Amino acid sequence: MGRLVRLTEQGFIDLVASLSRAARGPRGAGWRPVLGIGDDAAVLPSAGRLHTLLTTDLLTDGVHFRAAWTPGFLLGKKALSVNLSDIAAMGGVPRACVFSDGFPRRTRPAYARDVARGLADQARRHGLAIVGGDTCAARSLFLNVALLGAVEPGREVRRSGARAGDGLYVTGALGAAAAGL
């Protein structure tokens, strides 16, 4: 068995980038993402008038939140909100999402229902559809949302586009996520 190595955040980013290089997508027909790894969302070409935005975020108990401290309703809202902020940062409009979760067997059913209610409430508030998902038993609670959005070609806001003098806007309390709130 190999030696266990702890990955840093940059190590995880590098791992994802290497996976991207290994799997470039459909062959032929010139399909390529407009913008891939390294921004808030991928920008994908579309047959329609708008480009498709795709983002995903995974939240894990003990890393991104503490289930013992976090009401289920707020956790469900957070799971979608972290993805909504990625689409907004790219200048896009959210359209639809899929949601996956893993709950420990000891989880109270009311807590799981509250998570689902929080996610559904946030989806309604932003006019987007929940179109599917998956669930499983897990050792520790995790939630994952993949969100599709839309943006006009050439209008996506990229991280590389920031310039001196641009406005920077913050919602919520700085450091709250790191504090598990």
Residue ranges and their predicted role:
Residues 73-90:
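Alpha-helical scaffold segments that flank or form the walls of functional sites
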Residues 1-71, 90, 99, 114, ...:
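Extreme N-terminal cap/leader segments of soluble proteins
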Residues 11-14, 81, 163:
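Active-site-proximal helix/loop capping residues that flank conserved catalytic or ligand/cofactor
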Residues 42-45, 84-85, 162:
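Short amphipathic alpha-helices and their capping/turn segments at secondary-structure boundaries
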